[in-house]
Curated annotation (Swiss-Prot):
The lineage of its organism: Eukaryota, Metazoa, Chordata, Craniata, Vertebrata. The keyword Ubl conjugation does not apply. This is Complex III assembly factor LYRM7. One of its GO terms (cellular component) is mitochondrial membrane. It comes from the Eukaryota. The modification Phosphoserine is found at S60. It comes from Pongo abelii.
Length: 104
């Protein structure tokens, strides 16, 4: 698959993720749209394959971070927020053991 196709896929994926993460928040949706478009336009004339790969890695990391770490909060009352988690954020509660296992 060509590099231009991969860049376009990343661009579309970032916009889809933006729409899911900031659903019903017009201000955040618009700010994210502007930032995504701005960053892609800024690097539009980049020709170095190494630099393009580096930029794509950053874009992929941003998409993953948005999808797995950002939670939406809605103001319900004065000093009160209602958190709206998405399915991507919900993980199983796995027991954690901070003691290392002994090798035998």
């Amino acid at each position: 698959m060509g590099q231009a196709v991969k860049v376009l896929q990343l661009f579309k994926t970032l916009h889809r993720t933006r729409q899911q993460v900031f659903k019903n928040d017009a201000r955040a949706l618009e700010a994210a749209r502007i930032k995504i478009n701005e960053e892609f336009k800024k690097n539009k004339s980049e020709t170095s394959p190494k630099k393009i790969e580096e930029l794509m890695k950053i874009g992929s990391d941003v998409e993953l971070l948005l999808r797995t770490s950002v939670i939406q909060g809605i103001h319900t009352d004065h000093n009160t927020l209602k958190l709206v988690p998405r399915k991507d954020l919900l993980v199983e509660n796995v027991p954690y053991c901070d003691a290392p296992t002994q090798k035998q």
